[in-house]
Amino acid sequence: MNYLFKNGRYMNAEGTIVATDLLVQDGKIAKVAENITADNAEVIDVNGKLIAPGLVDVHVHLREPGGEHKETIETGTLAAAKGGFTTICAMPNTRPVPDCKEHMEDLQKRIKEKAHVNVLPYGAITVRQAGSEMTDFETLKELGAFAFTDDGVGVQDASMMLAAMKRASKLNMAVVAHCEENTLINKGCVHEGKFSEKHGLNGIPSVCESVHIARDILLAEAANCHYHVCHVSTKGSVRVIRDAKRAGIKVTAEVTPHHLVLCEDDIPSADPNFKMNPPLRGKEDHAALIEGLLDGTIDMIATDHAPHTAEEKAQGIERAPFGITGFETAFPLLYTNLVKKGIITLEQLIQFLTEKPADTFGLEAGRLTEGRTADITIIDLEQEEEIDPTTFLSKGKNTPFAGWKCQGWPVMTIVGGKIAWQKESALV
């Protein structure tokens, strides 16, 4: 099916929002211009809505295989499509871990059969993410590994991390890291700060993250490796990354919507839906994240979509697993709380969610350019809705944002020229 989207707005190559039509033919973007006509295309009048590149998320947890009670590839990618995401990168904390030929082939088969959006899987750095034996990077790359990471457990052994970075560098691949120094975690469930002190909870200190990033940056410099930092959350981490970039070290970084919108002062009680890793930090950390995003220290926004069951989250803040869902709330949360408040522009938000992650990892995504694959999101910037977890397509309903009123909701997502998700009656 060919589609002609009429009367839309999009961000052009100069970074300006302008009026446009957009023609999709044979799964590709055929033309982007005003007043397009086409004979054999279904015309969809978007009536002034934003035509954006499909959103790109480099940090997601789909749980399959092994955690299908939390999420599946089918439910997770449907939720991604509803949130406007057309390309997502799946972390390897599955069971089994994609750490060998057999496991990666099985994962890719599942993705091919079930995914509603483009899914790029990470390969594990070490076997079973155990930190002691390196995986076969060459084989994992041949089988489509997006990059290499041990995700939420991190690589604690510096010699192992250096060896991994050297091998990744030879393959022109990135090493991606969740940064925590295990000896400093302190069995924490929240940030070590006012909230932990008030509620008598063990806290995770900020230096737990920043000291690990500092170590890895020096290792990346020695290995000449592209090193990407997951979900930056502290003022110290921003400073270390900024200094590294000024020194010419190949480091990039992401921040989550929840760390841009919330800090520890916003946690109303010991609610497990506010438990994520890294935890919500202090006001100074929150301000540093905004500053880092604006000055280029932080390159992109990624959701860290981490679904859990209601039963798991009901165990209380100390026992419940870390993580919140992110796909279906990311854009409206950021548009309402950053763009509408004048902290960043709409153009910047689009870049942080599209071309910045795509360019960082060399993906053919993130731009509405003629000839490219038609991965597109239509967003109604005027639509206001209340976040209601019962409407989520994700199995995970674990969000701290229930009841928040937000503007700027995706209404249609196109993947490879086909409609992957559409809000009922939004475009008629």
From Swiss-Prot:
Domain of life: Bacteria
Statement: the UniProt record of this protein carries the keyword Zinc: yes
Positions contributing to Zn(2+) 2 binding: D151, H178, H231
GO-annotated cellular components: cytoplasm
Active-site residues per Swiss-Prot or TrEMBL entry: D304
E.C. number(s) listed in UniProt: 3.5.2.3
Co-factor note (free text): Binds 2 Zn(2+) ions per subunit.
Record function comment: Catalyzes the reversible cyclization of carbamoyl aspartate to dihydroorotate.
Protein name: Dihydroorotase
Annotated source species: Bacillus mycoides (strain KBAB4) (Bacillus weihenstephanensis)
Designated gene of the protein: pyrC
